[in-house]
Amino acid sequence: MEIRNGEICIGGVSVDEIANTFGTPTYVYDEAKIRENYRSVKNTFEKYYPDFKMFYAVKCCNNPAIVNILRQEGAGADCASVNEILLAKSVGLSGEDVMFSGNFLSDDDIRQGLESGVIFNLDDISILPRLLKFGTPELLSFRINPGYGKSNVGDFVTNAGPGAKFGIHPDKVIEGYRLAKEAGIKRFGAHMMTGSCIT
Protein backbone atom coordinates (compact mmCIF):
# COMPACT_ATOMS: atom_id res chain seq x y z
CA MET A 1 0.00 0.00 0.00
CA GLU A 2 1.02 3.54 -0.60
CA ILE A 3 -0.42 7.04 -0.68
CA ARG A 4 -0.60 8.64 -4.13
CA ASN A 5 -2.05 12.10 -4.59
CA GLY A 6 -3.72 11.82 -1.19
CA GLU A 7 -5.33 8.45 -1.98
CA ILE A 8 -4.58 5.01 -0.55
CA CYS A 9 -3.46 2.74 -3.39
CA ILE A 10 -2.79 -0.98 -3.64
CA GLY A 11 -0.68 -2.06 -6.58
CA GLY A 12 -1.03 1.42 -8.04
CA VAL A 13 -4.85 1.36 -7.97
CA SER A 14 -6.80 3.57 -5.55
CA VAL A 15 -8.92 1.79 -2.97
CA ASP A 16 -11.85 4.01 -4.04
CA GLU A 17 -11.58 2.67 -7.59
CA ILE A 18 -11.37 -0.90 -6.27
CA ALA A 19 -14.42 -0.39 -4.05
CA ASN A 20 -16.41 1.22 -6.88
CA THR A 21 -15.52 -1.62 -9.26
CA PHE A 22 -15.91 -4.62 -6.94
CA GLY A 23 -18.02 -3.34 -4.05
CA THR A 24 -17.25 -3.79 -0.39
CA PRO A 25 -16.15 -5.71 1.47
CA THR A 26 -13.55 -7.15 -0.87
CA TYR A 27 -10.13 -8.74 -0.57
CA VAL A 28 -7.25 -7.19 -2.49
CA TYR A 29 -3.86 -8.81 -3.02
CA ASP A 30 -0.87 -7.07 -4.61
CA GLU A 31 0.75 -9.60 -6.94
CA ALA A 32 3.90 -7.52 -7.42
CA LYS A 33 4.37 -7.25 -3.63
CA ILE A 34 3.81 -11.01 -3.17
CA ARG A 35 6.49 -11.71 -5.77
CA GLU A 36 8.85 -9.11 -4.27
CA ASN A 37 8.49 -10.54 -0.75
CA TYR A 38 8.96 -14.11 -1.97
CA ARG A 39 12.12 -13.19 -3.88
CA SER A 40 13.52 -11.32 -0.89
CA VAL A 41 13.17 -14.33 1.42
CA LYS A 42 14.37 -16.78 -1.24
CA ASN A 43 17.44 -14.73 -2.15
CA THR A 44 18.39 -14.32 1.51
CA PHE A 45 18.26 -18.06 2.21
CA GLU A 46 19.96 -19.02 -1.07
CA LYS A 47 23.06 -17.01 -0.08
CA TYR A 48 23.69 -19.57 2.65
CA TYR A 49 21.73 -22.59 1.39
CA PRO A 50 21.98 -22.81 -2.43
CA ASP A 51 19.52 -25.73 -2.62
CA PHE A 52 16.91 -23.94 -0.50
CA LYS A 53 13.27 -24.44 -1.51
CA MET A 54 10.42 -22.56 0.09
CA PHE A 55 7.08 -24.25 0.79
CA TYR A 56 4.14 -21.86 1.18
CA ALA A 57 1.77 -22.75 4.05
CA VAL A 58 -1.52 -23.00 2.16
CA LYS A 59 -3.49 -22.87 5.43
CA CYS A 60 -2.55 -19.21 5.90
CA CYS A 61 -4.37 -18.22 2.69
CA ASN A 62 -5.76 -20.85 0.35
CA ASN A 63 -6.51 -18.50 -2.53
CA PRO A 64 -5.59 -20.52 -5.67
CA ALA A 65 -4.34 -17.38 -7.44
CA ILE A 66 -1.80 -16.74 -4.67
CA VAL A 67 -0.69 -20.38 -4.58
CA ASN A 68 -0.24 -20.19 -8.36
CA ILE A 69 1.81 -16.96 -8.17
CA LEU A 70 4.11 -18.60 -5.65
CA ARG A 71 4.34 -21.75 -7.80
CA GLN A 72 5.44 -19.55 -10.72
CA GLU A 73 8.15 -18.12 -8.46
CA GLY A 74 9.40 -21.61 -7.60
CA ALA A 75 7.70 -22.29 -4.26
CA GLY A 76 6.19 -25.57 -3.22
CA ALA A 77 3.11 -25.90 -1.02
CA ASP A 78 2.94 -27.01 2.61
CA CYS A 79 -0.51 -28.57 2.98
CA ALA A 80 -2.35 -29.48 6.17
CA SER A 81 -5.21 -31.40 4.51
CA VAL A 82 -6.10 -33.43 1.44
CA ASN A 83 -8.20 -30.50 0.18
CA GLU A 84 -5.12 -28.29 0.29
CA ILE A 85 -3.18 -30.96 -1.64
CA LEU A 86 -5.92 -30.95 -4.29
CA LEU A 87 -5.74 -27.15 -4.48
CA ALA A 88 -1.93 -27.25 -4.88
CA LYS A 89 -2.20 -29.87 -7.63
CA SER A 90 -4.92 -27.84 -9.39
CA VAL A 91 -2.43 -24.99 -9.98
CA GLY A 92 0.24 -27.34 -11.35
CA LEU A 93 2.24 -28.44 -8.31
CA SER A 94 3.07 -32.12 -8.12
CA GLY A 95 4.75 -34.75 -5.98
CA GLU A 96 7.82 -33.37 -4.27
CA ASP A 97 6.55 -29.81 -4.64
CA VAL A 98 3.88 -30.60 -2.03
CA MET A 99 4.59 -31.32 1.63
CA PHE A 100 1.75 -32.91 3.63
CA SER A 101 2.02 -31.67 7.23
CA GLY A 102 -1.38 -32.84 8.43
CA ASN A 103 -2.20 -33.61 12.03
CA PHE A 104 -4.23 -36.66 13.09
CA LEU A 105 -4.21 -38.20 9.61
CA SER A 106 -6.96 -40.66 8.79
CA ASP A 107 -6.24 -43.81 6.77
CA ASP A 108 -7.95 -42.12 3.82
CA ASP A 109 -5.69 -39.04 4.18
CA ILE A 110 -2.64 -41.33 4.12
CA ARG A 111 -3.87 -43.24 1.06
CA GLN A 112 -4.64 -40.06 -0.87
CA GLY A 113 -1.28 -38.53 0.08
CA LEU A 114 0.57 -41.61 -1.16
CA GLU A 115 -1.45 -41.64 -4.39
CA SER A 116 -0.56 -37.97 -4.91
CA GLY A 117 3.16 -38.64 -4.42
CA VAL A 118 3.55 -35.86 -1.85
CA ILE A 119 6.24 -35.57 0.83
CA PHE A 120 4.85 -36.73 4.16
CA ASN A 121 5.92 -34.55 7.09
CA LEU A 122 4.98 -36.51 10.21
CA ASP A 123 4.68 -34.84 13.60
CA ASP A 124 4.20 -38.05 15.55
CA ILE A 125 6.13 -41.31 15.20
CA SER A 126 2.93 -43.28 15.84
CA ILE A 127 1.74 -42.36 12.33
CA LEU A 128 4.71 -44.12 10.69
CA PRO A 129 3.41 -47.74 11.01
CA ARG A 130 0.03 -46.65 9.60
CA LEU A 131 1.76 -44.90 6.69
CA LEU A 132 3.88 -47.98 5.96
CA LYS A 133 0.76 -50.17 5.98
CA PHE A 134 -0.35 -48.39 2.79
CA GLY A 135 3.00 -47.85 1.08
CA THR A 136 6.60 -46.73 1.38
CA PRO A 137 7.28 -43.17 0.27
CA GLU A 138 10.69 -42.44 -1.24
CA LEU A 139 11.05 -39.27 0.87
CA LEU A 140 9.86 -38.71 4.44
CA SER A 141 10.20 -35.73 6.74
CA PHE A 142 9.60 -35.39 10.46
CA ARG A 143 8.41 -32.23 12.19
CA ILE A 144 10.78 -31.75 15.12
CA ASN A 145 9.88 -29.86 18.29
CA PRO A 146 13.23 -28.34 19.35
CA GLY A 147 12.01 -27.70 22.90
CA TYR A 148 11.45 -23.96 22.62
CA GLY A 149 9.11 -21.65 20.73
CA LYS A 150 7.75 -18.13 20.60
CA SER A 151 4.61 -16.16 19.84
CA ASN A 152 3.73 -12.52 20.34
CA VAL A 153 0.03 -13.27 20.82
CA GLY A 154 0.07 -15.88 23.57
CA ASP A 155 0.93 -19.46 24.32
CA PHE A 156 -2.05 -20.80 22.36
CA VAL A 157 -0.20 -20.23 19.07
CA THR A 158 3.29 -21.24 20.20
CA ASN A 159 4.11 -24.11 17.89
CA ALA A 160 7.11 -25.57 19.72
CA GLY A 161 8.39 -25.99 23.24
CA PRO A 162 7.02 -27.79 26.27
CA GLY A 163 3.36 -28.67 25.83
CA ALA A 164 3.16 -27.66 22.15
CA LYS A 165 0.86 -29.83 20.05
CA PHE A 166 3.22 -29.99 17.07
CA GLY A 167 6.37 -31.97 16.56
CA ILE A 168 8.45 -34.83 17.88
CA HIS A 169 10.92 -34.32 20.70
CA PRO A 170 14.53 -34.54 19.43
CA ASP A 171 15.21 -37.56 21.67
CA LYS A 172 12.47 -39.53 19.89
CA VAL A 173 12.94 -38.39 16.30
CA ILE A 174 16.14 -40.45 15.81
CA GLU A 175 14.05 -43.56 16.47
CA GLY A 176 11.59 -42.40 13.79
CA TYR A 177 14.35 -42.00 11.21
CA ARG A 178 15.80 -45.41 12.15
CA LEU A 179 12.42 -47.14 11.74
CA ALA A 180 11.79 -45.37 8.43
CA LYS A 181 15.22 -46.35 7.09
CA GLU A 182 14.68 -49.97 8.12
CA ALA A 183 11.37 -49.89 6.21
CA GLY A 184 13.17 -48.91 3.00
CA ILE A 185 12.70 -45.15 2.90
CA LYS A 186 15.76 -43.66 1.19
CA ARG A 187 15.53 -39.89 1.55
CA PHE A 188 14.74 -37.79 4.60
CA GLY A 189 13.86 -34.27 5.62
CA ALA A 190 13.57 -32.34 8.86
CA HIS A 191 11.04 -29.61 9.60
CA MET A 192 10.55 -27.15 12.46
CA MET A 193 7.89 -24.55 13.12
CA THR A 194 8.99 -22.72 16.24
CA GLY A 195 6.63 -19.77 16.28
CA SER A 196 3.72 -17.87 14.84
CA CYS A 197 2.66 -14.21 14.78
CA ILE A 198 6.23 -13.14 15.55
CA THR A 199 7.11 -9.53 14.88
Segments and roles (model prediction):
Residues 1-120, 125-138, 175, 180-188:
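A charged N-terminal "starter" segment
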Residues 140-145:
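ATP-grasp fold ATP-binding core
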Residues 134, 146-199:
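Active-site loop/helix belt of alpha/beta enzymes
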